[in-house]
């Protein structure tokens, strides 16, 4: 009781001094003091805690002038995967809570529908056709000698320029080596990140499955875990991976409490192969996919709890989204696109629509927005909130969302362009979308025929081509009203959209006029640069020293030495 009274008295004295500095300003009334007293006692406990907090005020002042920024990125998560976005059996979790207490967008778009180009769009704020992140291939492979071009300014480099400490964990997929199997020329440590924890330079894929479900042995050419720029496990152990990323993130936050930071947390969930720790296995009524989502959800909750424990939650803006739409070809292991047609790799809405949540307690009012936003907007928004600006010598497709987030303003986007490599597939103008080319989209019945017990047949892949037999060209384009028909099921008749087509053509003309196409960088290969932690063990090793894991890797090493491993 005495300590609480002390807290109240101390607050009264501080507020009295502040009020006395103004000539004509009245002091706080009794109700305001009572409210402040309740807040202080509830949040800080007693006078000693309050004194400690006030003693730290000077240290936190720099951080408070610049909000911390955290980008939480899911892999292959569909817009319909979360309960808050309408999934009927996925259990509500902490991400749903962030959506309900933050701003949830119903029209979030990815910069591309495939991993590498969509991630380049996020970290640069520019469409892949501008940055050159396209080619005959659609992604950076472990034997690609190039990476995200050095002339592109990454979100980490931009935030460093704004006075931020930068960190990254998880999936990178924007290049690895250039001249040798270990030079790490294109890794995140060379692209503006001060701290790089455990990361997947290539990513997780069905080839990394260590359960025997998809193949007998993980492919060492594609499955490696790094810490900073050093390989620590090849192939990596799935169990415990999410916890490693979480712990790295928590440590980074705690190390940078007193200065502004940007943290990029790029989860391996929800990409196939699915995985979860024993604590989450068989806990979701949705099955393995639900288990995976719940594990990622808890990691996010623990990251946010760290912000709360360090009293910086109200000075931290969090973006949660996905790189693109769900990989439907993986049947029961793929995500949910909700009502939207198509999925990963396609220009239908299902390939580009993503969950998009912005959470900033005390600053962003809770709500739902139907404005169009894109993953490319994150860099422009973060840099602006940090009091800086992006370079003016190039075109940015991403726009600053500050007024949308804080004032409920309209979207800065009047249109959106859907590319497949360097091919313009479709254009959205307002509520209308014009398709110039479409990929064959398998019906749900066809999907069911191609899935054996919920798992894909070896030869089953959806059409994600940009041209060829499974791509249909439309001249004139087929048109959809996305407000009335978000599933793109009912094309408008030609007599109903002549005026809209004029607006589409105008948008394309403006787009083409300012387009400088980047030189493609995805087709330069050298198989000698594939990462290999130890050639003497056929590239099978573990240096992470995780409890209970070393024995597992020793078994793998023995197999590799005895029989060799798939290359």
Swiss-Prot record:
Recorded GO MF terms: arylsulfatase activity; metal ion binding
Post-translational modification note: The conversion to 3-oxoalanine (also known as C-formylglycine, FGly), of a serine or cysteine residue in prokaryotes and of a cysteine residue in eukaryotes, is critical for catalytic activity.
Co-factor note (free text): Binds 1 Ca(2+) ion per subunit.
Tissues/organs with expression: Expression is confined to aboral ectoderm cells and their precursors.
Keyword terms of this UniProt record: Calcium, Glycoprotein, Hydrolase, Metal-binding, Secreted, Signal
Active site: 115 (nucleophile), 173
Superkingdom of the organism of origin: Eukaryota
GO cellular component, one term: extracellular region
Catalytic activity as recorded in UniProt: an aryl sulfate + H2O = a phenol + sulfate + H(+)
The protein's Enzyme Commission number: 3.1.6.1
SUPFAM superfamilies per the UniProt record, alphabetical: Alkaline phosphatase-like
Annotated glycosylation sites: 179, 228, 542
Cofactor(s) the protein needs: Ca(2+)
One Pfam family, short name: Sulfatase
InterPro entries: Alkaline_phosphatase_core_sf, Sulfatase, Sulfatase_CS, Sulfatase_N
Keyword Protease in record: no
Localization per Swiss-Prot or TrEMBL: Secreted
Name the UniProt record assigns to this protein: Arylsulfatase
């Amino acid at each position: 009781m005495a300590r609480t009274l002390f807290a109240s008295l101390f607050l009264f004295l501080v507020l009295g001094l502040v009020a006395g500095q103004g000539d004509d300003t009245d002091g706080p009334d009794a109700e305001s003091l009572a409210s402040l007293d309740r807040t202080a006692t509830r949040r800080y406990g007693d006078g000693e805690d309050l004194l400690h907090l006030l003693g730290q005020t000077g240290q936190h002042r720099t951080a408070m002038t610049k909000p911390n920024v955290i980008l939480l990125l899911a892999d292959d998560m569909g817009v319909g995967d979360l309960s808050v976005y309408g999934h009927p059996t996925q259990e509500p979790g902490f991400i749903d809570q962030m959506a309900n207490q933050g701003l949830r967008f119903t029209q979030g778009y990815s910069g591309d529908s495939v991993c590498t180009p969509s991630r380049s769009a996020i970290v640069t704020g520019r469409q892949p056709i501008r940055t050159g992140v396209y080619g005959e291939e659609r992604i950076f492979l472990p034997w690609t000698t190039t990476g995200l071009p050095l002339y592109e300014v990454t979100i980490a480099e931009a935030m460093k320029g704004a006075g931020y400490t930068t960190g990254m964990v998880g999936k990178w997929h924007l290049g690895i080596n250039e001249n040798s199997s270990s030079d790490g020329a294109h890794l995140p440590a060379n692209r503006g990140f001060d701290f790089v924890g455990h990361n997947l330079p290539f990513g997780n894929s069905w080839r990394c499955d260590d359960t025997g479900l998809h193949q007998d042995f993980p492919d060492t050419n594609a499955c490696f875990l790094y810490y900073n720029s050093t390989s620590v496990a090849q192939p990596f152990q799935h169990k415990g991976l999410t916890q490693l990323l979480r712990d790295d993130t928590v440590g980074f936050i705690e190390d940078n409490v007193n200065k502004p930071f940007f943290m990029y947390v790029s989860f391996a969930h929800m990409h196939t192969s699915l995985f979860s720790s024993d604590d989450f296995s068989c806990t979701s009524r949705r099955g393995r996919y639900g288990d995976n989502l719940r594990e990622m959800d808890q990691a996010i909750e623990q990251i946010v709890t760290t912000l709360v424990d360090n009293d910086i939650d109200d000075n931290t803006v969090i973006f949660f989204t996905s790189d693109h739409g769900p990989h439907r070809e993986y049947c029961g292991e793929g995500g949910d696109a909700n009502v939207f047609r198509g999925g990963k790799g396609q220009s239908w809405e299902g390939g580009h629509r993503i969950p998009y949540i912005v959470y900033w307690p005390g600053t962003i009012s809770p709500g739902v927005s139907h404005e169009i936003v894109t993953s490319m907007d994150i860099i422009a928004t973060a840099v602006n909130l940090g009091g800086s600006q992006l370079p003016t010598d190039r075109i940015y497709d991403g726009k600053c969302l500050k007024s949308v987030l804080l004032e409920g303003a309209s979207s800065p986007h009047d249109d959106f362009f859907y590319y497949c490599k360097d091919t313009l597939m479709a254009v959205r103008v307002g509520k209308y979308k014009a398709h110039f080319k479409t990929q064959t989209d398998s019906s749900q019945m066809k999907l069911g025929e191609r899935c054996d017990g919920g798992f894909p047949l070896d030869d089953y892949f959806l059409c994600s081509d940009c041209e060829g037999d499974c791509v249909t060209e439309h001249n004139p384009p087929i048109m959809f009203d996305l407000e009335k028909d978000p599933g793109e099921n009912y094309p408008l008749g030609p007599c109903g959209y002549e005026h809209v087509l004029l607006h589409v053509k105008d948008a394309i003309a403006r787009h083409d006029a300012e387009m400088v196409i980047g030189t493609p960088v995805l087709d330069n290969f050298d198989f000698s640069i594939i990462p290999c932690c130890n050639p003497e063990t056929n590239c099978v090793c573990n240096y992470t020293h995780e409890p209970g894991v070393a024995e597992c890797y020793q078994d793998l090493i023995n197999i590799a030495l005895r029989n060799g491993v798939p290359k």
